[in-house]
UniProtKB/Swiss-Prot annotation:
Transmembrane segments: none annotated. Residues 152-161 have a biased composition (Basic and acidic residues). Residues 346-375, 423-453 form a coiled coil. The keyword S-adenosyl-L-methionine does not apply. This is Uncharacterized protein C6orf118.
Amino acid sequence: MAEEREPELYLKWKHCETPGVKTLCNLKHCETPGVKTLCNLKKLLNRLQKDHREDVYLYISGHLNPNKLYQPPETILQHWPNAHRPKGERASEVGEPPAGKVARMKEALAHFTIHTALVPSEAQDTPLFRYLNPQASLSHTSEEDFLPVEAVREGKEEKKGGPPGRGPPGWRRREELRLPDLKVLCYQEAGSRGTRDRHHYVSSYLAGATSADRYRMFLRFQKEVLAKQDLLKNDFTGSKAAAGHERKLQQELQKICTCSPQQFNRLHVFGKVFEDICNSSLIFGDLLKKVKDEYELYMATLLESQPAAQYEALLAQLKALGQRPVKTADMDLAREELRMLVTATKAALEQNDRLRSELEMEVALLQSAKERSESSEKHIIDENRLTLTEKVEKKRCEILSKWDEIQALEKEIKTTLVHTGISDITENRIKSIEHEAIQLETENMILKKKIKGPLEIYQGICKIRGNRR
């Protein structure tokens, strides 16, 4: 029964064909029963909603829109600052604890942490004592740095029985931490290589009581341990050290007397400076010292091998040469002869250089002539062996080279040379200008002569008038 009545239940909405008016007509049954050909109710409702939305939009977009009407500004009265501040929603209904209670809770936590800490053992056999006291003689640990056992026990008893925060006068609440000493290497001399490394302990610069003390300890640490001043004085190349040794050598040489013929004092000064260089050089000190020892041994052996009689003979000859009188005229004559010999030698050397250059030039010309003759002979032989096509190609290359030379000559003529007619015209123009200049000069002289007579007469008249006045 339901299936038979189902086609009658489907209705169809039909719009009127009247233009500009959207109304609904009467209901109309489907022509074909049993087939769902009527419009869907959902589509009809969507169309109705769309039309209604268009009508509303048309109404609010015109002059009847209340948002487009004139709205005078509202006067908002604020009796105190932040009166209309937006109120934030509270996360929970629980209120904040008072500040006094928070402070008491923090103090209770700190008190519990400090007074329940374990006290380290002070026995000398413990690892902590050996770490804090690397050397018994250099240790600065005092009894005040640690809490005494009796004081700790009394503090615990007081904490159990009495109120917190009160105790005997010897009881301390907190430990005073002391920074350990630093173990640094002792400086050694450059020559002492085989000795064992030595260390010493210095106090840390962070252990100062005030900032000024820490700064002074830091400067002393830089000077004694880091030794930065040595890095500033000595560079990597060693130029400053070399300049210092050179300055010392010059000062020592100026102090000694140069009158003695035997320069043993100078050798002594050189030896001392060389020994200073060996001691100051950290890398090559040992090597330089070995070289110095070998040289001194060689000199000692050489001096011992020479007999004393030969020394005395040489010394006598030196004294005789020093006491021999020498005339000034002989010295001047010898000096003049030496100058003449030097001049002749220079002239001979210049002549030798000139002849050598001429010889090299002749050899080069001879070599070029020989090569030219060989090339011409080879060229003739090659031409006889060439085929007709190769000869044509060769002539073509020669013609092209000649054509390039002709083009270069034409370019040079256009850029550098001048036509003969132009040069003749220029010469004639120069001659005419010179002739005009001569004419103008002649006319100028004639005019000067003509003006000279009246000018003298005028000057005489002026003199007469002056005398009359």
